[in-house]
Amino acid sequence: MKLIYTEMSYSMTEILVNEARKAADQGYRVFYIAPNSLSFEKEREVLTLLPERGTFSIIVTRFVQMSRYFTVESSPSKQHLDDTTLAMIFYRALMQLKPEDLPSYGRLQNNSVFIEQLVELYKELKNAQLSVHDLTGLDHPQKQEDLIKIIELAETIMIQQDYNQDSPLQSFARAIKLGLLNNQLSKTVVVIDGFSRFSAEEDYLLSLLNNNCQEVIIGSYVSQKAYQKSFIKGNIYEASLHFLQDLAQKYHIKPVFATSNQVFKPAFSRLTQLFEATHDFSQVDWQLQKNDLDHFSLWQCHHQKEEIEHVAKSIRQKLYEGYRYKDILVLLGDMDAYQLQIGPIFDKFEIPYYLGKAEPMAAHPLVQFIESLERSQRYNWRREDILNMLKSGLFGCFDDSDIDRFEEYTQFADIKGFTKFSKPFTINSSRQYPLDFLNEMRQDIVLPLQELFKSQKQLGASLVDKLILFLKKIRLAENMQGLAQSQLEVEKNEEVWKRFTDILTSFHHIFGQEKLRLSDCLALIKTGMKSAQYRVVPATLDVVTIKSYDLVQPHSKPFVYAIGLTQSHFPKQIHHSGLLSDQERARINEIRNYRHFDIASAENSKKNHQTALSLFNAATKELVLSVPTVINETFDDLSPYLKELINFGLPLLDKGKNYLSYDNSDIANYKALLSQIIAINRQDLIEMADQDKMFWTGVLRYLRKQLRKQQLELPTSDYRLSTKPLSKEVIEVCFPKGIPLKLSATALTVFYNNQYNYFLKYVLNLNKTESIHPDSRIHGQYLHRVFERLMKDHTQEPFDNKLKQAIYHTNQESFFQQVYQDNAEAEYSLAILEDIVRSTAPILQLNQNIQVIDQEKNFQLDMGNEILVHGIIDRIDQLSDGSLGIVDYKSSANQFDIGTFYNGLSPQLVTYLAALKQIAPHDINQLFGAMYLHLQDPKLDLVTFKQIDNTLVESIYKALTYKGIFSEVEKEHLSTGAYQTKNALYSNDELETLLNYNKYLYLKAAKHIKKGHFLINPYTSDGKTVQGDQLKAITRFEADLDMGQARRLVTLPAKEKKECFLTLMRKESHL
């Protein structure tokens, strides 16, 4: 064995490549070993350093791949053992054990997390060269007993099913120990680069290779100063020193110092020396030189998005200077936090990149389909799971529009659970769903699922056969082929499909002769699919490489950007979680030789120093280290390592907001420039410097000129939210000439509430999702129907009997039976409605001086100027003197307010008066009013009553009164009825004013509607809060930002309020 170390200013790869070339020139076969995470990059680096740029004598690979070169022909033809297969084997082993057999883990037998931990422990034992019987000294002896039972049973199953229990390295080591590879290894030289520690498995293999190979050469970075130190605790080279010292002591050799022809920039060497002096308690009498600072940058940004944008702009600048994408490396402090943001931003700046991290398959449609299938079976046909299966695009041959219609109906009819899915759809609504088509679709969905889900506990082989038959019926394979739209998607689909078929094969192999339930089968398949990952290879070598910073090696690229280096992530604190604690691992390691667990937490300090050292030397030309003040929406501090660099004299540059400028990095890329022009068009120029204002104003002026030539424009508005008028063609279709515009009191109220709401409801005809469950609309229909029946009954029956009959016959109507007898909640709602009817009905019995002459009266009111107002009057009453009035039933409290009417928000009663005047063409003297009747079950606070007497009854009836607009002429006739006339009496002239102003409201609204421009203007009564419908989800209206767009209501003092509003009405309606 030969141990080589060198300073950070030299290239260890060049030194080892020279050693490899010498061996190859002598006729030896050379294996150049690199860590798993670096083998691809190391291969490219090694081939670059070879004069001939390639050779068959030097193979750059990993330990695992090297073992296959030697054992591929002699390895036994056994089944491959991966993580999913291991999980299935442990699941089967736990199935065969009873809870009382496992005192410590009996309650976790079916826990998926526990099974994952068993898989990890088993793999750790293999890597550590340990068996389960070596787990002595655990905190609880029963833990070892339980683990022995589980793992021994699992290993028995592996033997029975002919699975290969040995890892590739174990098979390689066994072949070496048996002398099967002596001739080959005697002509082999092994060169190892990039390691600072070996696992127990690698350590054991290395001892065998050292005894059998021609030579083993290992290189590592250690400074001469550090190598001569006797005390190395806390030294930045501590990990490498321990690594070399352990090997030197074990193999009785002395490491040699070597240098390379390539020497990197002195700036990085000087920074490394300062870093080393800080941690080895020595001092230096010099500082970084001024020109050294040109190679380092410390950035501080506010948040991640700005940080990534600054990096992207800097990369564009490097390209402008003539560098290539492959010369740039981006390192992430927190891979999970940055992974979702960095892709879209790099795409915006047109920067091709390769993210060096396996991508989980969890978002693939096949994985989502399997998960939805398993949940559908487990949760008894839950609607969301059935719909997710359909939306995956892998179930049957359904168009998106068909799936949308099916989803809409199942939500309306509240279809959930097997019982409802298995029965034909019969309930319909005003939208007239195509029940015949939906039932055909329901059968296509239900029949294959029902056939699969009815499977009882049986052999695993039989379950797999039924599952495959189900997948054929729904055309899963054909649908998978239709998913791909690009070559990358085709490759991903192939990986997912292979993973899926491998899992089915493993399940059939392991559980083929075991009886288990379908739910267990689907759960195991789902777990295997969700844990799988894509292995994507970059389509080209000229890309920006992105990976986690702790995987970096010295001198990786000319330009390196390390971002997200906050205190929480740099350094990283790794803590192991599993079935064994770190303390238990440490006790086991004390009594083993060549066999030991890796304890990450025990090596955090020296590993982090090693990582920081590699990071500070990762670039050969320029290193940028960046930290955001906010990461994952949490404030974080500077890394202690970055604070050290600041103490060395490196300035911390506050990059601030990503302001627009005319630098090459801003305007040299089309997509980035376009996105910035859009951004600047939305913001105020006052945020910029004068020079920037002039530049961007000129750019926008030129852009608008070019857009005008192309008949395009950049919209401008004084408001944050703006709407466009409808085109002439759309206006002609929506509001054709010669056809009256149809309005109603409700439509008018919506218009004056928020014009855009009118556009959505009455122009686009958008409706809220319907539901079979009773809501306020259906409750109102029920109450109207009962009172309509009651008032039509002119028999001599007692009033209470009439009421009972009206309730009974209304409850027997098929629509109300479907609505109110569907479940206990609906039945409870019906009981409340019946109480409301019984409480409100007595008011009808008391008013014996009125006669109901019509109910549910439809009307069409011609307002002139091609405006037709339509509606339904609930009830028309006639007093003893022949005067007419209207009653509108309400399920909530309502009363007429002249101010609300003036602002267009309460036109209903006046509109009904106008319609009644048209229906019964009499003088206005014969109209006694229009009123609301609140259908309610009055609630009284008994604490306010000293005793139960007539005052209690009077209070109940006081709540049951008619409230609205009443003619002053008829007040004598109204005084004997349940009419609340206080402050509600109007003279004939005042009634005429109300009617004329009501017409004016309709004409004004119709004129605006026909223009086709609808504003986002919910009303505000005080200018501080918005009461109108804001439609935030659609309009993004924010009261604090868009108050200027709200319509301010006219409000007047309470004193003389009525007279003042009437005066305004006369003025505006030109009376």
Swiss-Prot record:
What are the disulphide bonds in this sequence? none
| Enzymatic class | hydrolase
Q: What is this enzyme's EC?
A: 3.1.-.-
GO-annotated biological processes? double-strand break repair via homologous recombination
SUPFAM superfamilies named among the record's database cross-references: P-loop containing nucleoside triphosphate hydrolases, Restriction endonuclease-like
* Record-linked InterPro entries: ADDB_N, DNA_helicase_suRexB, P-loop_NTPase, PDDEXK-like_dom_sf, PDDEXK_AddAB-type, Restrct_endonuc-II-like
Q: Which UniProt keywords apply?
A: ATP-binding, DNA damage, DNA repair, DNA-binding, Exonuclease, Helicase, Hydrolase, Nuclease, Nucleotide-binding
* Cofactor dependency: Mg(2+)
- Source species, domain of life: Bacteria
- What are this entry's molecular-function GO terms? 5'-3' exonuclease activity; ATP binding; double-stranded DNA binding; helicase activity; hydrolase activity, acting on acid anhydrides
Q: What else is known?
A: Despite having helicase-like domains, this subunit does not have helicase activity.
Which PANTHER family does the record match to this protein?
RECBCD ENZYME SUBUNIT RECC
By sequence similarity, the record places it as follows:
Belongs to the helicase family. AddB/RexB type 2 subfamily.
The job of this chain, per UniProt, is described as:
The heterodimer acts as both an ATP-dependent DNA helicase and an ATP-dependent, dual-direction single-stranded exonuclease. Recognizes the chi site generating a DNA molecule suitable for the initiation of homologous recombination. This subunit has 5' -> 3' nuclease activity but not helicase activity.
What subunit structure does UniProt give? Heterodimer of AddA and RexB.
Q: What is this protein called?
A: ATP-dependent helicase/deoxyribonuclease subunit B
* Provenance organism: Streptococcus pyogenes serotype M49 (strain NZ131)
List the taxonomic lineage: Bacteria, Bacillati, Bacillota, Bacilli, Lactobacillales
